[in-house]
């Protein structure tokens, strides 16, 4: 059986001696078939919420920093960001090597460097990265060039909708 939404729902239907669905009647289900579809998504959500950093949710983001802009939003699908993986990528044009950014707490940033966001004279190659409470990253000092920032994060799981949707969870799980 195919490892997609339709296949998983039909696994439930076969185990309970129900009629299997097809791709043509999958979208218009009612009753037990709708329950089976909900059960598949519920099981996937349960697995995804059990652990924050499943390997199949791992992703890498590259973001071009904007000159004099210290704040950057999380990716829309980010559950957690590995703050120890944030780095500036080597770029010979900008004359910069790979630089691992030091993690700083938001409270420490506010105590020591809060004025830096308003003082546009304080620019350079970022040396610190700060996670804010509102799902943003702050680069300190604010960039003076269009550096490439790279970091790793873990995605939020997603519900399956159409018959051919494939779960992000590997089949062996």
Label each PLM-derived region with a short phrase.
Residues 1-173:
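Glycine-enriched, solvent-exposed interface loops adjoining structured elements
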């Amino acid at each position: 059986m195919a490892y997609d939404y339709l296949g998983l729902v039909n696994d439930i239907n076969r185990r309970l001696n129900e009629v299997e669905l097809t791709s043509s009647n999958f979208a218009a289900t009612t009753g037990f078939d709708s329950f089976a579809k909900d059960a598949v998504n519920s099981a996937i959500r349960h697995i995804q919420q059990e652990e924050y950093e499943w390997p199949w949710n791992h992703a890498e983001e590259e973001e071009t920093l904007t000159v004099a802009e210290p704040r950057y939003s999380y990716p829309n699908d980010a559950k957690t960001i590995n703050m120890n993986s944030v780095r500036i990528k080597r770029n010979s044009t900008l004359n910069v090597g790979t630089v691992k950014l030091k993690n700083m707490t938001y409270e420490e940033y506010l105590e020591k460097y809060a004025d830096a966001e308003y003082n546009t004279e304080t620019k350079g190659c970022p040396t610190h990265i700060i996670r804010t409470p509102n799902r943003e990253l702050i680069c300190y000092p604010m960039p003076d060039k269009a550096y490439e920032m790279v970091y790793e994060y873990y995605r939020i799981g997603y519900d399956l909708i159409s018959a051919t949707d494939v779960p992000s969870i590997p089949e062996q799980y």
